[in-house]
């Protein structure tokens, strides 16, 4: 509902009271025009705002004797601008047009010193930009979604839902540094909310773990360690430990590889033998590198499932493990 309507009844009574008094002739036009504006408001006529602005202009020409009429007019001008912006968004679903109207409303709220309309307009703009960001996200236009999120954060830097959504859009753009900065800022602002913190940590951990796994697959081992270390900043993950073990084995850092493979096993203790095979394979590889042949043979035996079967067999043959 428009804020103007909340003031309408009081205005109408005030105008009626003014008309019963004795006014100088030069106020007659302002009074009549004011009453016309009230009638236009009652009829939802969009010309009402122009009428009240004319009232203000006439009162400024008259001077002090018309300040009472002017003060009543300026109480509704920002509200009427807000009503237009509100209807464009909520009724007509015209996001861009509503945002343009909202910017004009903010200027009117500042001009006529109406903090309530300013606050309401900012909230309306946040709704509009949120809708815009969501639409861009659905069509995978993540760069435009980020710009919409930035517009919200320019209005309210502490709008945490937008910080989270911006992080997701940056993830979609694969902008690691910007994603990390945004998700870290979000986490700093939601301290105490365990559910949201856990959710955000998982998003960040998964992003950097997957990126680290890709670097590992591409044999970019230093990059992989950097990315996996970033992932570990956001909590423990059994698959993260597996990736660490794999990278460290390739780097021949067998102690670190064995430690991480064992951590993965410990976290995934309830997994099936097939799902444990990857940890055992990396553990066996590390143990072989450390010269712990007997332990390596046992671990590689436990790794003989699925995609690790042939590789584990090959290592056992090379180690001359008992059959």
Positions of PLM-derived features:
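N-terminal leader/linker segments that initiate helical-solenoid repeat arrays
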Residues: 2, 21-96, 100, 323
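Flexible helix-coil transition and linker loops at the boundaries of alpha-helical arrays
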Residues: 59-74, 107-123, 188-201, 266-274
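Structural motif corresponding to the intra-repeat A-B loop/turn of tetratricopeptide repeats
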Residues: 43, 91-92, 132, 139, ...
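Terminal, low-structured helical/coil segments at or just beyond the last alpha-helical repeat
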Residues: 210-222, 274, 281-285, 289-323
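Residue-level recognition of tetratricopeptide repeat
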Residues: 29, 62, 112, 125, ...
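Canonical tetratricopeptide repeat
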Residues: 69-72, 76, 83, 117, ...
